[in-house]
Amino acid sequence: MSGMRGSLGVHALALAACIGLDVPVLAQDNSGLVAGKDAWARASCFDCHGSMAQGGSGGDYPVGPSLRNITYDKETMVGIVSCGIPGTPMPAWLKGAYTKVECYGMPLGSTPAGMTVPAILTADEIKALVDYVFATFVQAPRP
């Protein structure tokens, strides 16, 4: 069976080359998704948003919205994950958010009342996380 699996991998690479995709880029893109999946797990996004980003169900964590039908672009999502959403349970995950990195035009050192700032992810990790969410969960818009 492992020979079959290896053969499929070779065929996939050959197909990618035939249609003009740069095979090293495919591997690089996959590593970015792996990094995004790791950031999703480290930040425990599934606790609030559900294991398949379908929206949380409560319990011990706030009910986060479904990410499957979001209409935000990636840049907006990076901002939300980085700085959280003041007045909601959405925390700020960016290292240095509100202290070293300006959020929502607030002066450094000013954190909104009630804002949780775990600040465990780098900017690159947040970008990878957002890429992972879009590639894995967000449904393509209908024409």
Predicted segments, located by residue:
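Generic structural signal for secondary-structure transition and capping sites
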Residues: 45, 86-89, 138
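Bacterial N-terminal signal peptides that target proteins for export
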Residues: 1-12
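Electrostatic cytochrome c docking/interface patches
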Residues: 22-41, 55-56, 63, 76, ...
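The canonical Cys-X-X-Cys-His
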Residues: 36, 42-52, 81, 129-133
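Gly/Gly-Pro-rich "capping" loops immediately C-terminal to redox-active cysteine motifs
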Residues: 37, 50-118
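C-terminal capping alpha-helices of c-type cytochrome domains
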Residues: 101-143
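Bacterial N-terminal signal peptides
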Residues: 11-20
